[in-house]
Swiss-Prot record:
Cell compartment(s), UniProt: Cytoplasm; Cytoplasm, Perinuclear region
GO MF terms, alphabetically ordered: 2'-5'-oligoadenylate synthetase activity; ATP binding; double-stranded RNA binding; metal ion binding
Principal localisation: cytoplasm
Species the sequence originates in: Rattus norvegicus (Rat)
Region (OAS domain 2): 373-713
Protein name: 2'-5'-oligoadenylate synthase 2
Sites bearing N6-acetyllysine, chain numbering: 408
Activity regulation text: Produced as a latent enzyme which is activated by double stranded RNA (dsRNA) generated during the course of viral infection. The dsRNA activator must be at least 15 nucleotides long, and no modification of the 2'-hydroxyl group is tolerated. ssRNA or dsDNA do not act as activators. Strongly inhibited by copper, iron and zinc ions. Partially inhibited by cobalt and nickel ions.
Keyword Thylakoid listed: no
Length: 733
């Protein structure tokens, strides 16, 4: 370190000192019409939602040429300090808003992190940073160009970098580089961080600047439009600072940036998103600070014991919790006093946005991760965050009634085709819908579809006809309809989004034409046998048919199989579906996961064989389903509620089905539908996620008392269902 280093005082910085709040200057008016100039002079919360994007471009985004000049000025400072032998700069990294490329027009913040070879460990930074700041200050003030722009306040050294129209208040930070040669942090890095913090009694997050390289990398992967949304949130926050008497803590600005990233990641992940939906979602999250718990596992995870213990300690801290994705000790969301003020302001802006048309709903984002929900709180989690309320369900019902009325009375009125019946399917009909998931399935049984063959060959033309009629009639019905583009040449389903004045938000629909295989006597076991016999004969004659090809014909049976179950079991199904959605989001590139219906059936199976009671423990049920997913290679699950082994043709077919490659999960409504699918889907990815979830707080009653799964066989045999048939394979637990 040099002979002069040991003589320095050991009293160091108490962490990143607070930056002074900068009063936001008036926005520059750019290309605004006379009647729009007021937009740049008013509170952002008063800007009409349809004008927000224009407002960002005209008032918040800095000029690119100005930023280039700022970069040149900052690079000049870097070069000057790198040339100073006594500072021993190994590497310079730009941080703060400047480094994250979330700079607001006019004035913004930034850091210049100087990784120095003089600091060999975290403790050195704590001991000697102030002395090194003295040296840097002297070097800059000795330069004619910088002596007037350098300011020193205790442990804070700043340089004002300004050009006409843009300025950056740059904080200079000599720092230890824990990454050294490696670009990615190992668990050892975070172990050293925790040990060093304990030794020198450092504050949480005090060494977060050491990870500025990771922070910069974390933000650079996100699209420019997301950074536009971040600018909007930051500008709103800056305007609020002018209203508050006490300056808010600087980490709060970073917390809002991270919260905006979280909202986009969890709810959208598309580059060309709607800014209004984005800001609604962020405001919705801000308005519930006592529920906020946000973190990432990009740079650290739960695998190492030291890191895991620290991470779980942080995640179980009082809300709000927003962890720095590069430093697990740094909760940038703490300080509930200001969050309450923010929550009130966010709700006020949210209410004003709701008055603007068209209404753009929030993305489906929860304020806290499911992973850290304690086992005893799972039922409350389901009720608060997953179970839809009556208003939502009535909304869906009204939308379904609109489409059903159109199909029955209008769509085929000028043809000989009759609508035999319309069945409401999907999660809404089964009673397992999730909050904010405004979708509905409608199955329309047509007289002209009188066989499985006719359904196979003609359904695409009826999809086109329904679309044609809906397009023609939407004005008469005062509807707004946006059709999804099908990737299939001959689509089996018509997917569209419905908007109406009678609906508070848009609703997504799937309409499927179907053959009425069960007829009006669907409760008659004989009619089901006939329908299944025809289906099996068709499969025997056509090798190209995939299993479940005609499952739409048995939607009523699928619906009734789930809908009649206890309310608490349907809550567990919601929990499993939410878990599945989280797994789905993590898959990059998108993987072909098993259908959600397979997980629903597995949940019912786990409950039937593990509990069977209305008052079961939700954590135990959840744990059991994950255990079955982990053991997917052994799974063989089926039911005999709608078909069984008694009839010869059915018995032979079922014995063939259950001898297929695992996993096998037969649709209880359609014996040809194996939603387990063997190798068809990526069960191994789902199993990997399930294993990682075993360390979740959901399964911890006490530190050394994990929740245990129910004892459920992974293999269902004909004998276990009461059939007098020698088991194909033995039951396995």
């Amino acid at each position: 370190m040099g002979n002069w280093m040991p003589g320095w005082s050991s009293s160091g910085s108490l962490g990143v000192p607070p930056m002074p709040v900068q009063k936001l200057e008036k926005s520059v008016q750019v290309n605004l019409e006379p009647d729009e100039k007021c937009l740049s002079q008013t509170e952002v919360s008063s800007v009409p939602s349809q004008k927000l994007e224009e407002y960002i471009q005209a008032n918040l985004k800095p000029d690119e040429e100005s930023l280039k000049q700022i970069d040149q000025a900052v690079d000049a400072i870097s070069d000057l300090l790198c040339s100073e032998v006594m500072i021993d700069v190994l590497k310079v990294v730009k941080g703060g808003s400047y480094g994250r490329k979330t700079v607001l027009r006019d004035c913004s913040d930034g850091t210049l992190v100087l990784f120095t070879g003089l600091f060999k460990q975290f403790q050195d930074q704590k001991k000697y940073q102030d002395k090194l700041l003295d040296l840097i200050e002297q070097r800059l003030k000795s330069h004619e160009k910088y002596k007037k722009s350098v300011k020193r306040k205790l442990s804070l050294l700043e340089v004002q970098v300004s050009i006409p129209g843009q300025s950056i208040l740059l904080q200079l930070l000599p720092t230890f580089n824990p990454l050294c040669i490696s670009e990615n942090p190992s668990a050892q890095v975070y172990q050293n961080l925790k040990r060093s913090m304990d030794q020198v009694k450092a504050s949480p997050g005090e060494f977060s600047d050491c990870f500025t390289t990771l922070q910069q990398r974390f933000f650079e992967k996100y699209p420019g439009r997301l950074k536009d949304l971040i600018l909007l949130v930051k500008h709103w926050y800056k305007q609020l600072q002018d209203k508050w008497i006490i300056p808010s803590p600087p980490p709060l600005l970073y917390a809002l940036e991270l919260l905006t990233v979280y909202a986009w990641e969890q709810g959208c992940q598309t580059k060309d998103f709607d800014i209004t939906q984005g800001i609604r979602t962020v405001l919705q999250l801000i308005s519930q600070p006592t529920n906020l718990c946000v973190y990432w596992l990009d740079n650290y995870n739960f695998e190492d014991e030291t890191v895991r213990n620290n991470l779980l300690h942080q995640l179980n801290s009082p809300r709000p919790v927003i962890l720095d994705p590069t430093d697990p000790t740094n909760n940038v969301g703490k300080d509930d006093r200001f969050w309450q003020l923010l929550a009130e302001e966010a709700q006020e802006w949210l209410n004003s946005l709701r008055l603007n048309k068209p209404h753009k709903p929030c993305w489906d984002v929860l304020p806290m991760p499911f992973f850290i929900t304690p086992s005893h709180c799972l039922d409350k989690f389901i009720k608060d965050f997953l179970q839809p309320d009556k208003v939502f369900l009535n909304q869906i019902k009204r939308a379904v009634d609109i489409i059903c009325s159109f199909l029955k009375e209008t769509c085929f009125q000028n043809s000989d085709i009759k609508v035999l019946k319309i069945i409401k399917g999907g999660s809404t009909a089964k009673g397992t819908a999730l909050q904010q998931r405004s979708d509905a399935d409608i199955i329309v049984f047509l007289s002209s579809l009188d066989s499985y063959d006719s359904l196979e060959t003609e359904r695409s033309q009826y999809v086109q006809e329904i679309r044609k009629q809906l397009e023609a009639c939407q004005k008469a019905f005062n509807l707004g309809v946006k059709f999804d583009i099908s990737k299939w040449m001959a689509p089996r389903v018509l997917s569209f989004t419905l908007e109406s004045k009678s609906l508070k938000q848009s609703v997504e629909f799937d309409v499927l034409p179907a053959y009425d295989a069960l007829g009006q006597l669907r409760s008659d076991y004989t009619s089901r046998l006939k329908a299944y016999k025809k289906l099996i004969e068709l499969y025997a004659s056509q090798d190209s048919l995939k299993g479940g090809e005609f499952s739409v014909c048995f939607t009523e049976l699928q619906r009734d199989f789930i809908e009649t179950r206890p309310t608490k079991l349907k809550g567990l199904i919601r929990l499993i579906k939410h878990w599945y959605k989280q797994c789905e989001r993590k898959m990059k590139p998108k993987a072909s996961l098993p259908p959600k219906y397979a997980l629903e059936l597995l949940t019912v199976y786990a409950w039937e064989h593990g509990s069977g009671t209305d008052g079961f423990d939700t954590a135990e049920g959840f744990r059991t389903v994950l255990d079955l997913v982990i053991r997917y290679r052994q799974l063989c699950v089926f039911w005999t509620v709608n078909y069984n082994f008694e009839e010869d043709h059915m018995r032979k077919f079922l014995l063939t089905q259950i001898q297929k490659k695992r996993p096998v999960i037969l649709d209880p409504a359609d014996p040809t539908g194996d939603v387990g699918g063997g190798d068809r889907w990526c069960w191994h990815l789902l199993a990997k996620e399930a294993k990682e979830w075993l360390s979740s707080s959901c399964f911890q009653v006490e530190p050394k008392s994990p929740v245990q799964p129910w004892k459920v066989p992974v293999v269902q045999t004909p004998g276990s269902c009461g059939a007098q048939i020698y088991p194909v394979v033995g039951g396995v637990y």
